[in-house]
């Protein structure tokens, strides 16, 4: 039985993981039934500890973009990477992508890879950071879409719970001081 330390990896760099082709019944990283399921993205910051449990396995297909904070030195991204708040989200708050969004993210990652194969010069870190920044800007857009989608679903859930509670009160069952059970509200 491996210890917790053997299941944990401490990152000393930023990491962007794109996990593709999760099985249809997979509820990885907080995905809900109403979320897109084509791919999932997870973001890690330097110093963050990533834990793998026995239930979690590495994906069959995906990408990992890892970059050290030093890469951002003397770039505009260094000054505002803290604005990409999703780097501090819990794993359960991962980004779930549609097919079109996955294609756009994959294109951004491909552009980063192309730049990495270019001979290094005085422009390399700036161009790389701009490609990374574009990727992160798309992720911001997709997270905002996910928040809107979830807000609508959560609003519908709350409206349904309110309707059930009103029905419960109208039936007279609350008079005895007995609150509805979670089973009733489900």
Region roles according to the model:
Residues 66-70, 113, 136, 181-186:
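Juxtamembrane/interfacial segments around transmembrane helices
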Residues 10-13, 129-136, 158, 162:
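Generic structural concept
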Residues 70, 138, 142, 164:
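Phosphate/oxyanion-binding loops and surfaces in catalytic or ligand/nucleic-acid-binding neighborhoods
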Residues 141-152:
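C-terminal regulatory or interaction extensions
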Residues 2-90, 99, 121:
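N-terminal regulatory/effector-sensing and dimerization cores
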Residues 86-134, 138-143:
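Amphipathic alpha-helical segments enriched in hydrophobic/aromatic residues interleaved with Lys/Arg
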């Amino acid at each position: 039985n491996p210890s917790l330390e053997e299941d944990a990896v401490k990152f000393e760099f930023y990491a962007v993981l794109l996990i593709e082709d999760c099985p249809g019944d997979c509820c990885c990283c907080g995905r809900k039934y109403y979320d897109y399921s084509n791919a999932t993205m997870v973001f890690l910051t330097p110093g963050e500890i990533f834990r793998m449990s026995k239930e979690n396995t590495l994906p069959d297909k995906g990408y990992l973009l890892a970059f050290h904070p030093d890469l951002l030195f003397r770039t505009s991204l260094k000054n505002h990477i803290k604005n990409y708040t999703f780097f501090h989200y819990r794993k359960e708050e991962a980004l779930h992508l549609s097919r079109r969004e996955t294609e756009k993210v994959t294109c951004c990652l491909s552009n980063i890879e192309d730049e990495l194969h270019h001979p290094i010069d005085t422009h390399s870190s700036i161009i790389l950071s701009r490609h990374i920044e574009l990727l992160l800007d798309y992720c911001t857009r997709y997270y905002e879409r996910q928040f809107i989608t979830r807000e609508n679903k959560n609003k519908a859930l709350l409206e349904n719970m309110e309707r059930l509670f009103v029905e419960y009160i109208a039936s007279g069952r609350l008079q005895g001081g007995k609150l509805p059970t979670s089973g009733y509200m489900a």
